[in-house]
Structure formats: C-alpha cells, structure tokens
C-alpha cells in the first residue's frame, strides 16, 4: 500500500509539473523542448516541435510554429518558465509550421535568424501560402493575426551566439530538407535541435528536399555525439533515430523510383510504400503528397 501511495503521489506531481509547463520539457538546466507530438492537426502545426535556450542575457527561441495563435500559446508557456527578454528566434527552416509564428516574437523585439536561402524561400512563398491556407488544411481563423516576418539576420555556413554563459552554434545542414536548413547545436549539454532534418515516428515532408545532401547531413549529425536530439516532429530522439531516418529515406526513394519507372500511379506507389515502411503518423496524406511532388511531377 505504501508503494502504491508513493507511486500515486509521484504521478500527481508529474502531472502537475506537465500542466505547469504545458508542453515544455526540461532537457538541461537552461534548455527546454516544446514537443507537439500529441496533436498533428494543421492548426496545431502538424505536431511541429520548438524549444528555448535560456542564458544570462536572455532567451533564444528555436522555431515559432504555424501561426500567431500558436506562437502566442508557445510564448505563454515560455513565460511560465522565465521572464527574461527573448533576444533571438532561430528558424531551422522557413516552412509554415516552423516560421509563421515569427510575428509574435518579432513584436517583442527579438531578432529572427535563418540561413539566407530559407529567408529567400519565405520571401518567395510566405504570402501566397497565407492566401491559400486552405490547401494546407487551415481555416482563416487558424491564421488570424498571422503576418509573415522575414529573418532580419542570416548567415552562410556557421554562426555562434553567446547568450551569456551559454554557447550556441547554428550550423547549415543544406541542401537537405530545404536549401537553407540548419541545426541548433549546444556543445556543452550536447543537445541538438535538428529541425526537419529528423522526423521521428512521423512520415517526413520530402517535397523541397535534396536527398543526397540530406543523407550526408544525417551522417554528419551522428558525429556530433548528441545526448539528446529534438527532432522537427516527434518525441525526444537519439542517434539511433538519425540512422533510422537514413534507412527510411533510402528505402522510400528506391521504391518510389522503381515503381514510377514501371508506370505505377500515385495510389499504387503510396500503398506499396506504406506496406514496406515502418508505421508512422501523417501516413496516407504525407506519403501520397511526397510521391506526387517528387516522382510523378509530369503526370
């Protein structure tokens, strides 16, 4: 009975803690992940992840989710952890589910940072995506108050940020998921925010990807020796998940190419891929979209 009571108290404490942080998970003394894996709906950013790093001088935010509404939700949870000024926002890439919440943090005076290629991508496609949000399963009310905010600072290959006692490395890992994808690496606690280089338990979005570079990037990330990896989508991960992502990409590309060359249509190719690949979230929709956009563009 004593063991049961102790266990019950522990569970209650953990539940209270999770409610207090509302999605923020403490990874180290000053690093938190914001994991969205429980709700993969469009209005909740397709379960995109984000995070924060807290230094003596302020806060760095990693990705801002899909809308002003989602950004405000994220900000409210950040304020339960710290009242320090938010100095920087880093977009690991500028797809809508990772960068359309920029407006919330820019209003606070945060400097938004990305790789130069993904600033160009957002400038080219952001307004059009807002105009045709229904194509992404979003309703007008989901994007109420959302404005496209382009990164104010860019870099080419690598950038270091001293947040006051916390060293942060921004490393270009492209071309891969996009032409300007980057990772956020904290060498001291060995924590990596991979952005959409890594999808764990989710089928990845491949439409803008360059698979040869993506596979090389996954090789490189395994050499960093991260103790904890926050993927772009999915639960807290490890090097094992990076390796499984490589296996997935190779298998997807090989099978899709072979079947497309035989004249198979999108439904047949998707069905075979879903039969072969590990079961993951966003299955039929994502796999079908990837097949049509990468392997059947002329059909």
What are these regions (language model features)?
Residues 76-160, 179:
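Active-site HxH/HxHxD metal-binding segment of metal-dependent hydrolases
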Residues 58-60, 66-68, 160, 167-251:
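Metallo-beta-lactamase
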Residues 20-22:
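Boundary at the C-terminal end of the N-terminal hydrophobic targeting segment
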């Amino acid at each position: 009975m004593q063991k049961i009571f102790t266990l019950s108290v522990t569970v209650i404490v953990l539940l209270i803690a999770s409610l207090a942080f509302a999605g923020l998970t403490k990874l180290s003394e000053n690093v938190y992940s914001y994991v969205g894996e429980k709700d993969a709906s469009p209005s909740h950013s397709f379960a995109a992840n984000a995070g924060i790093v807290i230094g003596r001088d302020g806060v760095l935010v990693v990705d801002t989710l899909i809308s002003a509404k989602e950004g405000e939700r994220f900000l409210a949870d950040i304020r339960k952890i710290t009242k320090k000024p938010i100095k920087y926002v880093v977009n690991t890439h500028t797809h809508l589910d990772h960068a359309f919440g920029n407006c919330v943090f820019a209003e606070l005076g945060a400097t938004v940072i990305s790789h130069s290629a993904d600033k160009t991508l957002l400038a080219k496609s952001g307004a059009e995506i807002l105009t045709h949000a229904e194509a992404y399963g979003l309703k007008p009310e989901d994007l109420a108050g959302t404005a496209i905010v382009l990164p104010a600072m860019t870099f080419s290959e690598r950038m270091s940020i001293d947040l006051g006692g916390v060293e942060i490395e921004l490393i270009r890992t492209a071309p891969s998921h996009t032409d300007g994808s980057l990772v956020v690496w904290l060498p001291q606690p060995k924590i990596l925010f991979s952005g959409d280089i890594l999808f764990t338990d989710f089928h990845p979005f491949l439409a803008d990807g360059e698979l040869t570079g993506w596979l090389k990037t996954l090789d490189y990330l395994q050499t960093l020796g991260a103790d904890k990896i926050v993927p772009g989508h999915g639960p807290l991960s490890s090097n094992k998940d990076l390796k499984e992502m490589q296996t997935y990409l190779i298998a997807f590309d090989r099978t899709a190419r072979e079947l497309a060359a035989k004249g198979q249509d999108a439904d047949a190719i998707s069905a075979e891929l879903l039969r072969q690949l590990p079961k993951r979230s966003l299955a039929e929709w994502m796999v079908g979209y990837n097949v049509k956009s990468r392997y059947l563009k002329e059909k």
